[in-house]
C-alpha cells in the first residue's frame, strides 16, 4: 500500500482525490495549507505528493521548494494539481521542479494512470 500526501485546500477536490486513491488501495495523508503539507511530508515521508498550486498560506511552488530542501524527500515525486490551463503557467509549474502537471477538473483515468506511473517508476528527474 502506497502512502500519498494530498495538499489541497478545496474540500470537494480533497474528497474526490482521497476517495479515488483510497478506492485504489492507497493510504492518504491530507493537508489544507502549504506549510502543513511540508510538515506532513517531513513527518511521514510519503511515496507520492499531490500538490495544489493555489493554497491559502504559501503557494504549491513555494511548498515544493521547502520539500526539496529535505534530503529524505528529494526522491519523492511531487505532482502539481491545478486549474491553471494556460500553457505558460503549466510550463512555469513544471520548470519549478514538479514531476508532472495534472489539470483540474481531473480526468479520472488520466489521474489514476499518472499516479500509478509515478508510484511504479519514481521521479523521472532527480
Q: PLM features: residue spans?
A:
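Conserved acidic carboxylate
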Residues: 8
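Two-component/phosphorelay signaling modules centered on CheY-like receiver
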Residues: 11-29, 96
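Acidic catalytic/metal-coordinating carboxylates
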Residues: 12, 33-36, 59-62
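Alpha4 helix (beta4-alpha4-beta5 surface) of REC/receiver domains from two-component response regulators
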Residues: 15-18, 62, 85-101, 113
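Short hydrophobic/Thr-rich beta-strand motif most characteristic of the beta2 strand and flanking loop
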Residues: 25-32, 40, 102
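Active-site residues of response regulator receiver
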Residues: 52, 82
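The feature encodes the CheY-like receiver
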Residues: 56, 65, 74, 86
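C-terminal output helix
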Residues: 106-116
Amino acid at each position: 500500500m502506497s502512502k500519498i500526501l494530498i495538499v489541497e485546500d478545496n474540500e470537494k477536490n480533497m474528497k474526490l482525490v482521497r476517495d479515488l486513491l483510497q478506492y485504489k488501495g492507497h493510504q492518504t495523508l491530507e493537508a489544507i495549507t502549504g506549510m502543513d503539507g511540508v510538515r506532513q511530508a517531513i513527518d511521514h515521508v510519503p511515496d507520492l505528493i499531490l500538490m495544489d498550486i493555489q493554497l491559502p498560506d504559501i503557494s504549491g511552488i513555494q511548498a515544493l521548494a521547502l520539500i526539496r530542501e529535505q534530503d529524505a524527500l528529494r526522491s519523492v515525486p511531487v505532482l502539481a494539481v491545478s486549474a491553471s490551463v494556460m500553457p505558460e503557467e503549466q510550463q512555469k509549474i513544471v520548470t519549478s521542479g514538479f514531476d508532472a502537471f495534472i489539470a483540474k477538473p481531473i480526468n479520472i483515468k488520466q489521474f489514476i494512470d499518472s499516479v500509478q506511473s509515478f508510484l511504479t517508476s519514481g521521479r523521472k528527474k532527480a
